[in-house]
A protein has these predicted regions:
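Sequence/structural signature of beta-propeller modules
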Residues: 20-139, 162-164, 489-490
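Beta-propeller blade signature
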Residues: 124, 180, 228-229, 265-267, ...
Length: 490
């Protein structure tokens, strides 16, 4: 199966370098209805208000999850569904899964590929033409690495306030790349070697700055948690001997990391070394569920106002788990605020961050997704989207709604608190070989699907864990294996 799909994927990806105006080839037109629902009026919902990390680009444009609290939320409007314009744009081979925007409105991304090393790109947000590239160092992946579940080497990166890309490489370095004001060049500004604290088969999953300017980083294998001082180049680290396959979350005075076993709060010790300030084991079935990278939580932790942080565990059925972020609890408080089961047993898993809107969390079901090389790559996934709210006293939670109709295989969805809509990317049940993908909007208030519109069919329109993004003008963007798809109101 793998050998059969490799040429297919390569054919889907290989397009001319200057391909901004060309649509993605749609090899299997859909047989299902291409537009359902109708435009809605905006319904403002309460918003989480993450602080601005001074070391990162302005919220919500600094990383795949928008801000250092990883809320996946926008305070401005995305499409409402009026005269929707859905387009596709072919690009040079790579998947630009993390989309950020620089101070001049250009798309900035780091794009892993199966046919070349990761490539940093500047992309025109209007034409989707690639304006500049930088080929990043590459290295052979450790044995046993699943090609399309490997987020090292740029899958996670962040953009700072000076329009600089900070990205880990597959060679276990941290590169700092300057994007020119006109977007026409990318130049290397710094290169930090982190191999002194990493073993040969360890790769950096993610690197992020704390509010004081230190750069934290984590490795998947072995669970190394490290700190780099960019000024002195001093590196300190500890090893958890667990797996860390997600990115992490940064608050003003702490860093929150979830491993395949536990939820952690970290601080900085007197020696400058990472120190565990609290940790909590979560429920775990021990099963690597279909769509998951390992037998553990699939979420990057998400903080919301009031001192709460959420993940999903790996129980069956899966729970939304909410913790208190505080280092020390007040009298009568418990570390775990709630554990709320969502989606049916044997059919619940997520490999994406939870969305936050004040005291509401929104969670997507990815159970059953197989990467493009998987034996069931053409099959639809299990349905499910849910909302869980923290009560006003902060002492418990409840499930507000579940939508068991939408099937979102792997996208990082987003919520607009200005429209009250959740934006996701779904697959419809259709005849085998059809594989239609849709832009889909849900009501954050009720969970009902309000509209959806056809994006394209087949492998070129598979987003494979890429994150949806809303541009400054409200246009929705999503990387797919064939390039990028966009959606906006007419």
């Amino acid at each position: 199966m793998i050998h059969r799909l490799l040429p297919l994927l390569a054919a889907a990806l290989v397009v001319p370098a200057a391909a901004g105006a060309d649509p993605i080839t749609n090899p299997v037109p859909t047989t299902v209805e291409t537009h359902q629902g109708a435009a809605v009026t905006a319904q403002l919902i309460p918003a989480t208000t993450p602080p601005q990390n001074p070391q990162m680009a302005p919220n919500p444009w600094s990383n795949i999850h928008n801000d250092s609290w990883m809320t996946d939320a926008y305070a401005y409007a995305g499409p409402l569904g009026k005269d929707l314009i859905a387009e596709s744009h072919s690009m040079p081979p790579a998947l630009c899964g993390s989309i950020t925007f620089d101070s001049h409105g250009h798309i900035v991304s780091v794009c892993p590929s199966i046919v070349q090393g990761p490539q940093a790109r500047v992309i025109d947000a209007k034409t989707l033409e690639v304006m500049a590239t930088y080929n990043m160092p590459t290295a052979q992946d450790p044995p046993g690495t699943k090609m399309y579940q490997n987020f090292s080497g740029g899958g996670y990166f962040f953009l700072d306030g000076q329009d600089r890309i900070w990205s880990a490489t597959k060679t276990s370095h941290l590169l700092v790349l300057q994007v020119a004001a006109d977007g026409k060049s990318i130049t290397e500004e710094a290169d930090y070697d982190l191999t002194s604290v990493l073993e040969g088969d360890q790769r950096i999953t993610s690197a992020l700055p704390d509010f004081q300017g230190r750069i934290w980083f984590v490795s998947k294998k072995g669970g190394t948690v490290g700190i780099l001082d960019p000024k002195s180049k001093k590196i300190t680290s500890i090893k958890l001997n667990e797996e860390i396959e997600n990115s992490f979350t940064v608050d003003r005075d702490a860093v929150f990391i979830v491993s395949d076993k536990r939820m952690y709060r970290f601080g900085v010790g007197k020696s400058g070394k990472p120190v565990v300030q609290w940790k909590k084991t979560y429920k775990n079935s021990g099963i690597v569920k279909p769509s998951q990278v390992n037998a553990g939580s699939g979420t990057t932790p998400t903080i919301t106002n009031g001192g709460f942080i959420s993940i999903t565990d790996n129980a069956d059925p899966m729970n939304v788990v909410v913790y208190r972020t505080a280092r020390k609890l007040k009298k009568g408080q418990k570390r775990v605020v709630c554990e709320v089961p969502i989606f049916p047993a044997g059919k619940s898993a997520t490999e994406n961050s939870i969305l936050a809107a004040k005291r509401s969390f929104f969670i997507e079901n990815n159970y059953g997704y197989q990467d493009p090389f998987g034996p069931n790559s053409g099959a639809v996934t299990e349905a499910g989207f849910a909302r869980v709210d923290i009560n006003k006293k902060g002492t418990g939670c409840k499930k507000v709604w579940e939508n068991m109709d939408v099937r979102a295989p792997s996208v990082v969805p987003k919520v607009s608190t200005a429209t009250g809509l959740i934006y996701t990317y779904t697959r419809e049940e259709a005849p085998m070989g059809d594989q239609p993908y849709f832009w889909t909007a849900l009501s954050a208030k009720t969970g009902k699907t309000v509209w959806k519109i056809y994006a394209g069919s087949g492998l070129p329109f598979n987003n494979n864990y890429a994150g949806l993004a809303l541009g400054p003008d409200g246009t929705a963007y999503l990387a797919v294996t064939g390039g990028m798809v966009t959606l906006k109101d007419g």
